[in-house]
Amino acid sequence: MKVTGFSAVILWTQRIDETLRFYQALGLPLVEEDHGEGPIHYACYIAGVHFAIFPGEIGEAVSRRSGGCTQVGFNVSDVDAAFATAKELGAKVVWEPRDMPWGRAALVRDPDGRPVELNHTPQ
């Protein structure tokens, strides 16, 4: 058996509205979903990977985590524009856009403090 790819990235948040606006502003086409079992949440597919944001009650989101840190990374067409949008939404800057050996990148924190890397790798 081997891992052949990612199937899902699920974020739990107590700041659902703020987190939804943040990721939608970065270009994720998140739409409301309700499967009848569990909370209404927002989701989309990015390159075949299910990305979802779920609301979590106080303590619920923490109990679903093992205590580690989750970092999300997105390929974007324009790192500087994505960074500016994130900053306008109040994202905390970890490091500003910079050229890397493989392309351009920036790192910010989403409304819950998770690191979000914005990348562009020229083809």
Feature roles, as predicted:
Residues 1-7, 26-74, 81-109, 120-123:
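Vicinal oxygen chelate
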Residues 10:
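Polyanion-binding surface elements
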Residues 13-16, 37-38:
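Conserved beta-strand-loop-alpha-helix junction that forms the acyl-donor binding cleft
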Residues 15-17, 77-79:
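Helix N-cap motif at beta-to-alpha junctions
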Residues 19-24, 86, 113:
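Conserved active-site tyrosine of GNAT-family acetyltransferases
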